[in-house]
A protein has these predicted regions:
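Short helices/loops that flank or line small-molecule/ion binding pockets
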Residues: 1, 95-110, 122-127
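Short, glycine-/small- and polar/acidic-enriched structural segments
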Residues: 1-56, 64, 133-134
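Beta->alpha turn/N-cap motifs
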Residues: 1-13, 95, 111-118, 138-139
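Ligand-binding "clamshell"
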Residues: 9-26, 119-139, 145-160
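Extracytoplasmic/secreted proteins, especially bacterial periplasmic and envelope-associated proteins
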Residues: 22, 54, 68-75, 97, ...
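Bilobed "Venus flytrap"/periplasmic-binding protein-like clamshell domains
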Residues: 32-104, 200-205, 215, 224
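A bilobed periplasmic-binding-protein/Venus flytrap-type ligand-binding module shared by bacterial periplasmic
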Residues: 32-45, 142-148, 165, 173-188
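An extracytoplasmic/periplasmic, membrane-proximal ligand-sensing/linker region
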Residues: 97, 114-134, 144-151, 175, ...
Length: 224
């Protein structure tokens, strides 16, 4: 199971992947990996993703070092032209420690790409409320991000998705993709796929993120 950008990088041999993995095959899109770029509201006057340009030396978490969150976060910020390399004081933490750090005032924001709702975001919002902002995306920034790899699409948080969230939030998500190798027997791939989709209701009882899974969009946003 790969994040969509890693599927694209694996096929082309770009980003953190050293050479093309042309033996890889996409089986289908699973649930969405939803971008939660979070920033203290005092630094987010517009509430939009480009407010990240207001960071000037403060600590910000893109994820754990060498994690998928860090790699996709760097790609997104590079593509948007946000100068995080010189303006952010990057910290590297997992989701749990990141939540504690923002609650304690040790960081000003965090990048949490995950299936929504995310428990770490829920905890942070429960304590900080309107002092915290999940940044919105615009059509312009979405188009810019999708220029090379058209993987991302809109993902909406209606009010109440997170504690103390009173306004609609429009962010983006890319699919987590189930992949296999070209040499795996077709029947084995079929049986695995069949088991997943025939037991979707059970998966949805285990984790709310799987409620995004639908057959009609299972081939959208595949990177390979």
């Amino acid at each position: 199971l790969l994040q969509g950008p890693f599927g694209a990088w694996s096929w082309t041999g770009e980003g953190p992947v050293s050479k093309p993995q042309t033996h890889m095959r996409s089986v289908g899109a699973m649930w969405q990996n939803v971008e939660h770029f979070v920033l203290l509201s005092r630094l987010a006057p517009t509430g939009e993703i480009m407010d990240l340009n207001n960071i000037d030396g403060e600590r910000y978490v893109l994820g754990q070092r060498n994690s998928g969150a860090e790699q996709t976060g760097r790609f997104i910020l590079d593509t948007l032209g946000i100068d995080y390399q010189s303006k952010f004081n990057l910290a590297y933490m997992g989701y749990g420690p990141t939540t504690s750090a923002i609650q304690d005032g040790n960081i000003v924001g965090m990048n949490v790409p995950a299936g929504a709702p995310v428990s770490s975001i829920t905890q942070a919002y429960a304590l900080l409320g309107d002092r915290l902002t999940i940044l919105n995306w615009t059509q312009e920034t979405l188009d810019l991000l999708n220029a090379k790899y058209p993987l991302w699409d809109w993902y909406d948080f209606p009010p109440g998705t997170y504690p103390n969230q009173t306004k609609h939030i429009r962010t983006i998500g890319s699919p987590n993709v189930l992949v296999t190798r070209a040499d795996i027997p077709e029947d084995a791939v079929y049986q695995i796929t069949k088991v997943i989709w025939e037991n979707l209701a059970t998966l949805q009882e285990i984790h709310g993120a799987t409620k995004d899974m639908r057959l009609d969009i299972a081939i959208e946003g595949l990177g390979a």
